[in-house]
């Protein structure tokens, strides 16, 4: 369902990193991370970072 990059972003969100920190770590722009998060939220039906983290934890994606 989620792409490998989206899974990587969710893992970093769960680790408590900000969008800017994630962008720096992955060599992307913060806007690209925003786009990844919007895509993730839409695919899994959530509206927040904490809900995305909970979703990933419940499905053992982390």
Where do the protein language model's features map onto the residues?
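Short, basic, alpha-helical segments at the C-terminal edge of helix-turn-helix-like DNA-binding modules
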Residues: 47-60
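Helix-turn-helix DNA-binding segment
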Residues: 1-38, 42-44, 58-59
